[in-house]
Amino acid sequence: MKNILLTNDDGFEAKGLLELAKKLGKIANVVIAAPSTEKSGSSQSLTLTRPLRFIKIDENFYKLDDATPADCVYLGLHALFKTKPDLIVSGINHGANIAEDITCSGTCGAAMQGALQGIPSLAVSQFFTGKSLKNSGFDLACDIAYKVVCKIFENGFPLLNKQFLNLNIPSVCKKDFKGLKIAPAGRKFYDTNAQNGINPRGKKYYWLGKMDIKFDISENQNTDIGLLSEGFATLTPIKPDMTAYEQINGLEKWLKI
């Protein structure tokens, strides 16, 4: 039987993680290594300034105390497997990870860490609005992720080394689901948002709020943003090399000025 290392960034008690573990357990031996608390927005951050400790929850189920998702992958591979697993899956995230959000996502950061370790990796996220997640749950996301994992096991991982797959599920019920499409990451426009306050000792603090994010749907019709809003699930190949190759020649000319 194949072996899967499963993690997330919503914490070891998150419903998306537990339901996906149950679903993937039908085709693989699933070992869970998840953060003890929510670590959204942690990207591929690793904890380098203090020791970390695995706490066993159940058979093949561990939480890593106050760790990041990337920590869970890194130490999960080091401590929980004698040989590398066949696949690393991160999710199901409670919320989409699309466009530039991918760069700060803890869910995608875990998949990136897996890819850098040379292991096929898949990030899975469920888009939701309002109470749609409570109403629809993770059944559709589990089904689609299951099919993608089966395809990986049957046909091999379709990407080059150090690349991973980013799967996003639309906020629709099964009867309104339009299918799975390959899509590039879209583009958003970001602004800051934070609440100011004074702590009991009279010191000023800031509490980061939900980022003000906007996008032009006309420019994103065939991206993960547009297709997700139309009821499609999207599968996007992601690589860690963020070099803007098309700018290199222009930058060399600029440097000579």
Curated annotation (Swiss-Prot):
It catalyses: a ribonucleoside 5'-phosphate + H2O = a ribonucleoside + phosphate. It comes from the Bacteria. Nucleotidase that shows phosphatase activity on nucleoside 5'-monophosphates. Belongs to the SurE nucleotidase family. Keywords: Cytoplasm, Hydrolase, Metal-binding, Nucleotide-binding. A divalent metal cation binds at D9, D10, S40, N93. InterPro entries: SurE, SurE-like_Pase/nucleotidase, SurE-like_sf. Binds 1 divalent metal cation per subunit. It is found in: Cytoplasm. Pfam families: SurE (PF01975). HAMAP family: SurE. This is 5'-nucleotidase SurE. One of its GO terms (cellular component) is cytoplasm. GO terms for molecular function: 3'-nucleotidase activity; 5'-nucleotidase activity; exopolyphosphatase activity; metal ion binding; nucleotide binding. Its EC number is 3.1.3.5. Its main location: cytoplasm. Its cofactor is a divalent metal cation. It comes from Campylobacter hominis (strain ATCC BAA-381 / DSM 21671 / CCUG 45161 / LMG 19568 / NCTC 13146 / CH001A). The gene is surE.
